[in-house]
Amino acid sequence: MGALRPDSGTCTVLGADSAAPEFLSLKEDIGVVLDEAYFPESLNALQVGGVMAKTYRRWDGKQYQNYLTRFGLPEKKPFKDFSRGMKMKLAIAVALSHSPRLLVLDEATAGLDPIVRDEVLEIFNEFTREEDHSILISSHILSDLEKLCDYIAFLHQGRLLFCDEKDRLLEEYGIFVGTADQVNSLQDGA
């Protein structure tokens, strides 16, 4: 969000060039969940909500409280004593409680147990049911991508190798698991 400058190329987010000064005003419209949740360890969930209420103009304390209840998060337990799953749920509650239009998820479900991951994926699906809501997700968990995404892009060493509709990829391509010799013996176009 302005901390890094691209070496080349451009990035447009919600219609604004990421290098343009007006891009900073979009921070209210973007919710971010990283692979690790970063909140002051001494704060509890209620205190985190208080800080966020001063950070975001559109902070919805009632919505935040609803997520805390839905996730079964303790309101007065210090963040440092949260499990990984609890930390991720708190980060998701924060990201969703200021009415973002775009969620940016960086390995947000990695390391979560399957039950928690399914619960989180359902919340992300609920989010995208709103027409003006989108998710940009970075994940190594292919089943998460299959459940959430309409389009799949593959980046390698900072380059976009392909971007296509998920359904087209599922229809036209498959996954082959084999030894190096088996892969080398495949015919071209197989």
Predicted regions and their residues:
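ABC ATPase "signature
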Residues: 163-164
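Helix-to-loop junction immediately C-terminal to a conserved catalytic motif
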Residues: 1
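Conserved ABC transporter NBD signature motif
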Residues: 9-17, 25-26
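Catalytic Walker B motif of ABC-type/P-loop ATPase nucleotide-binding domains
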Residues: 103-107, 112
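ABC-family P-loop ATPase nucleotide-binding domains
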Residues: 28, 32-90
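Helix N-cap at the start of a conserved alpha-helix in ABC-type nucleotide-binding domains
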Residues: 114-116
